[in-house]
C-alpha cells in the first residue's frame, strides 16, 4: 500500500485552498451545470461543441476539487509563529542577493501546494528552495540551472 504524499503548507495556504474549494464546489459547479443544460437543449450531442466544452470544464473542475481535498486531507500545516529566524525553513521569508542580476530578492519558502513564482513564493522542493532550507544569514548557495549556475547570498531571514 502506497503512502499518501504529505503537503507542507502554511495556515495562509490552507485558507486559500479552502476558499478555492468552496468557490469550485458552489459557484463553478453551478455555472458548469447550467452550461451543460443549455448545451443539451441544442439537441444532437455528436456535433455539439458547447456540450463537449462544458463536459471538459466539468472534468477539470472535479479533478481540481479532488486534488485540493487530497492536499487538505494530507496537509502538514506549518505554524509560522513558531518559526525561528536563524535558519531558513518552510514559512520563512528570505532576502537574498542574486549575483547573476546583482539585485536583492525576497522569497517566501512554501510547500509545493502553495508555490507561486509570480508572488516569489517558491517551493521547498524547488532547486532554489531546497538549497536555501537549513541555511543561515551570510551563507551562499549555488543552484544548477539549465544555463549554468545561479549564486545567491542570504541577507536576512524573517
UniProtKB/Swiss-Prot annotation:
Summary of the function given for this chain in its UniProt record: Necessary for efficient RNA polymerase transcription elongation past template-encoded arresting sites. The arresting sites in DNA have the property of trapping a certain fraction of elongating RNA polymerases that pass through, resulting in locked ternary complexes. Cleavage of the nascent transcript by cleavage factors such as GreA or GreB allows the resumption of elongation from the new 3'terminus. GreA releases sequences of 2 to 3 nucleotides.
InterPro entries listed in its UniProt record: GreA/GreB_C_sf, TF_GreA/GreB_CS, Tscrpt_elong_fac_GreA, Tscrpt_elong_fac_GreA/B, Tscrpt_elong_fac_GreA/B_C, Tscrpt_elong_fac_GreA/B_fam, Tscrpt_elong_fac_GreA/B_N, Tscrpt_elong_fac_GreA/B_N_sf
Listed GO MF terms: DNA binding; RNA polymerase binding
Name of protein: Transcription elongation factor GreA
Coiled coil: 14-76
Matches recorded under Gene3D superfamilies: Transcription elongation factor, GreA/GreB, C-terminal domain (3.10.50.30), Transcription elongation factor, GreA/GreB, N-terminal domain (1.10.287.180)
Pfam families, alphabetized: GreA_GreB (PF01272), GreA_GreB_N (PF03449)
PROSITE patterns: GREAB_1, GREAB_2
Keywords, alphabetical: Coiled coil, DNA-binding, Transcription, Transcription regulation
UniProt similarity note: Belongs to the GreA/GreB family.
Any GO BP annotation: DNA-templated transcription elongation
Amino acid at each position: 500500500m502506497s503512502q499518501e504524499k504529505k503537503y507542507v503548507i502554511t495556515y495562509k495556504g490552507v485558507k486559500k485552498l479552502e476558499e478555492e474549494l468552496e468557490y469550485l464546489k458552489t459557484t463553478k459547479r453551478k455555472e458548469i451545470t447550467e452550461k451543460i443544460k443549455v448545451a443539451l437543449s441544442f439537441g444532437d450531442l455528436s456535433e455539439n461543441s458547447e456540450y463537449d466544452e462544458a463536459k471538459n470544464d466539468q472534468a477539470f473542475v472535479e479533478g481540481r476539487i479532488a486534488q485540493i481535498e487530497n492536499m487538505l486531507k494530507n496537509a502538514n500545516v506549518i505554524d509560522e509563529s513558531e518559526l525561528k529566524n536563524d535558519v531558513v525553513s518552510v514559512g520563512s521569508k528570505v532576502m537574498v542577493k542574486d549575483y547573476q542580476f546583482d539585485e536583492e530578492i525576497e522569497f517566501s519558502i512554501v510547500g509545493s501546494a502553495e508555490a507561486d513564482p509570480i508572488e516569489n513564493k517558491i517551493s521547498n522542493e524547488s532547486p532554489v528552495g531546497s538549497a536555501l532550507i537549513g541555511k543561515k544569514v551570510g551563507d551562499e548557495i549555488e543552484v544548477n540551472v539549465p544555463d549554468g549556475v545561479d549564486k545567491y547570498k542570504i541577507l536576512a531571514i524573517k
